[in-house]
């Protein structure tokens, strides 16, 4: 179970994501299968 979500207010940036909507930056970012947000082009 994934309970850690991205904290968009953290200066260090995203922590963990469970789904794409957890990512900061909108549709430009996706949640990878290892729980980090990455930008896709």
UniProtKB/Swiss-Prot annotation:
Its main location: secreted. Expressed by the venom duct. The keyword Lipoprotein does not apply. It comes from the Eukaryota. Keywords: Disulfide bond, Secreted, Toxin. One of its GO terms (molecular function) is toxin activity. GO terms for cellular component: extracellular region. It is found in: Secreted. Contains 4 disulfide bonds. The keyword Secreted applies. Does not elicit any observable symptomatology in C.elegans. The cysteine framework is XI (C-C-CC-CC-C-C). This is Augerpeptide-s11a. It comes from Terebra subulata.
């Amino acid at each position: 179970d994934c309970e850690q979500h991205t904290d968009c207010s953290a200066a260090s940036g995203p922590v963990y994501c469970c789904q794409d909507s957890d990512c900061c930056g909108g549709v430009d970012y996706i949640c990878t299968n290892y729980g980090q947000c990455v930008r896709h082009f």
